[in-house]
Structures are given as C-alpha cells and as structure tokens.
Amino acid sequence: MSMFCYQCQEASQGIGCTVRGVCGKTDDVANLQDLLIFTLKGISFLNLKAREAGVNKEKTDRFLFEGLFSTITNVNFDRNFFINKIKEAVALREEIKEDLKKAGIEVDESCEAINWVYDTDEDIEAIAAEVGVLSTKDEDIRSLRELITYGVKGMAAYAYHAYQLGYKDDNIFRFMEKALAKVLDDSLTADDYVALALEAGKYGVDTMALLDKANTSTYGHPEITKVNIGVRNNPGILISGHDLKDLEQLLEQTAGTGVDVYTHGEMLPAHYYPAFKKYPHFVGNYGNAWWQQDKEFELFNGPILMTTNCLVPPKDSYKDRVYTTGVVGFEGVKYIPEGPDGKKDFSEIIEHAKRCKPPVEIERGEIIGGFAHNQVLELADKIVEAVKTGAIKRFFVMAGCDGRMKSRTYYTEFAKALPKDTVILTAGCAKYRYNKLNLGDINGIPRVLDAGQCNDSYSLAVIAMKLKEVFGLNDINKLPISYNIAWYEQKAVIVLLALLYLGVKNIHLGPTLPAFLSPNVTKVLVDKFGIGGITNVEDDMKMFMGE
C-alpha cells in the first residue's frame, strides 16, 4: 500500500509523504483519513439539503467537526479508530438520506461520496486507496481544494473547542458543509475556489471569535501572568494539547490528592486565565514545543494526558504513561472517554501519578504571558504613546507553530537580531523559539507579548484592528506591523486565510511554503496578497525594516 499526504509543513522533500508520514502515521491510516474526509464531504452535501428542509440534526454537526479534527496532523494514528469512524460516517450518511426521502427531497445519487458502500474492512481500505488527494488530476484545482479543506479542518478544531464549552454557531457549521460540498464540484473554476478560500477566512475569523468568547466567558480574560517553569517534589500529571475543559476537570479531580498538574506545549496559556489561578497544585509549565516531547515526557516521570494535537508516536520507555482523550488516538495507549453527562473520569491517571516519581527538573525560572486582546487594550494608551514617541518603531507578528526542522532556529536568531525598539506579538507554540530569551522591555512593555494558543491569533488581529482605529488609518497594512509567521499544520492554514480575509498583505510564511500550493496558486497568493517565504535573518531583517 502507498499514500500521499502533504497537509503539514514537514511533507517529505517538500513534496509529500508517500510511504509513511514524517509525523509517524502509517500509509493505511493516511488513506483511511482520506476516505473519512471524502465521506464527510458527502455528508456535508446531504446535510446542506437537510438544513434547507429543516431536518438536520445537531449530532451531524458534532460528527463533522470531530471527524475533521481527528485527521489534523498529530491528532490520531489509530487504524481501528478510523475504520470505526468511517463505518459511523456511512451509517450517518444513510440516515440523512432517509430523512431527506421522508421530507420529499430528491438526492442526486451520482456523487460517489454519498453512494460508496462496503461489505468488509478490506473493502474500506481498497476504496480508501482510491479517493485521496491525487484523485483530483488538475494540479491547481487540487491545490485550491486542499487549501480549503485544510482551512476547514482548522476551523473544525476551533469549533470543537467552543462546542465543548457550550458555544456553537450554525452559520459556521453551514459554511463548513458548503465548503466541503463545493470541493466535490467539478464545475467550479480556480477563481471560484480562490473566492471560497477567502470566504473560509471570514468564517475562520468568526470561529476564532466564537472560541475566544467561549474561553473568556468561561474562564475570564487572560491577564499578565508569570508562569513557573521549574518543578516541585510531588508526583505530577502533564497535560498537553489545547482543551481547557479537560484541564478544568483534571484540576478539580486532582485537588487534595497530592498530585501536581503541569502544562505542556500549547497548554501553557491556560495559566493566563483567572479561573485556573485558584488551584494551588497547578504548578507551572514543563518543557517546550510538541516536537521535543520524546525527551521531555521521558524525564517528566508521571503520566501525560493528550487532549488534542500534537502527539508524537510515543517511545516504549514512556508509552504506558500516555493517556489520550477526545479525538486523540494511538494504538496501545489508554483512552479516557467522555461520559453520557459530558464529564470525564480521570481517576485512573490520578492513581497512576501517585505511583510515579516527581518530574526531573529540566529548567527553572519564569516566563511571562497573558497578552490577549483584552489585556493589551488595557495597555493601549501606553503602547500608543510608545509608538508616537518612537520608543516602539515596529511590531512583528511571529505567531504560529513550531516544528522539528533544524531551519526553524531561524526564528530564534531573528528574534535575537530584532532592533531593541521592536516588539514581538505571538500566539501558538512558535513562541517557544524565543519566549525564554529575556529580550527585555520597552517602557515596561515586554518585547515578547504572548497572546496564547494558536487560536488566540484572533487576539493579534483584534489588536491590529484597534491600532488601525486609534491611529486613524484606513488600511491595516499602513500600521508598523510586519508578519513573519511559522506554520506547521492545518490550524495555521485557517489563521492564514483569516488574515487574508481581514486584508492583511505581505505575510511571510516559513520555514517553507506549503507543499500543497502549486506554482500557479502560489503566484496568485504572491501577486494578490504579497505572500512570501523567508531567506536568512540578515536579508529578511533588511527587507522587513525597509533598508
């Protein structure tokens, strides 16, 4: 069997993974993910009609965003999960067809995504090998379809987190279905798909705004916070991923047990929320970005809870300490399900922690963050004054993702080389390349302002729009803000599309441009939006500073 996947920044040789994913997923899992996406496109096609007829069901929305989320890079590697999810998808698809039939709605059965069938698991795997990315022959149409699909995957992840906290928007679900249905439509042109990609950007903004509302309404607005990066002498649980509801339940259930809780990776920003500060056993952040987990999980000694991406295939030395939940999966790793009441029982992982040694200290000190839009706007007068007096000459948005590539040391060197009158605005795990450098401050304003998780790139957009208003500008691109963004997976794609929708131009992406962008599509993005790559720190610095 073979595969073809180029959805992440680490696509093999900058082209695509064909034997095994650089991420670690096997060819059969990659193909099954393709078939799940194909079937979700069919469900989307049908559910649009169900919405029009008023016979759509909320469970379809949830199935859609959970299914999409499970195919994001470093979320789920479990073959059996995808076999079962595909079977559920086919059953749901047939249920929607039946509902449409009862409502007197005719369905065009010529679309393969809504009519393929199977008898055995072998049938599923055979079909999976036929419906992947390369089944679209035209390179440019394929490129645009994948750009949209990956953007919708990112949107689905953010919609999932908002939904976990009780927030949803049917307009977002409707767009996701519309976009997935349209990538099946062979009558659409490249121009149609460019327009659809920008529309995805609009709904990306809406989804990030919804998640921001969900998080801040539930846990309060992030505030300036110093986070401990050392350890205590108690056993601990390390929680990674992005799911704040999982963290809340874990903190509640570990209270008074003698077990400490540490964040890892993208969970770091949880410390910025007021609601989590009441837990004395919520100790700090352990380690760095996701790709270093193979060493850090080993040293942590206690169990690790993966709530979302990024999971790296675990080494045998700590595999028995890894627990997954939500849509995360890996064969042979313990899974903690959600109960019928929406709650999770973390007693097993807590008891496991009690049997473990305390974490090995790998660093000590503090890092500062919590500069989401509400906090930054409280500092607006100070920031505006610093800009007007020339104390701050330029802001650099360096949000995004971190990754394994050695060339990503560029971002550390770039941050070090920035003039002392510049400020970095960041969100996502890209921050780990420079958030421990001690770059100082400008009139009390730290030179690295961390807004939070990757979805908190929304905060950076809100800050930019507010600065545009304060300075009386009619174009966001006239602000002294440059965009030097590191990307890795599909959530970064929806953030990019959101920025393009908001009119931001001259965004530089690295360490490489996406493999899924064909030369012609890349040219459109360069010509229309000024998208660029990166070269080296010295030349890029001159370019950004207008020298």
Swiss-Prot record:
Q: Please give the name of this protein.
A: Hydroxylamine reductase
Instruction: Enumerate the HAMAP family for this protein.
Output: Hydroxylam_reduct (MF_00069)
What reaction(s) does this enzyme catalyze?
A + NH4(+) + H2O = hydroxylamine + AH2 + H(+)
Q: What does this protein do?
A: Catalyzes the reduction of hydroxylamine to form NH(3) and H(2)O.
Cofactor(s) in the UniProt record: [4Fe-4S] cluster; hybrid [4Fe-2O-2S] cluster
Q: What class of enzyme is it?
A: oxidoreductase
Instruction: State the organism named in the record.
Output: Thermoanaerobacter sp. (strain X514)
Q: What is its main location?
A: cytoplasm
GO BP annotations listed: response to hydrogen peroxide
Chain's gene name: hcp
* UniProt: [4Fe-4S] cluster binding residues: C5, C8, C17, C23
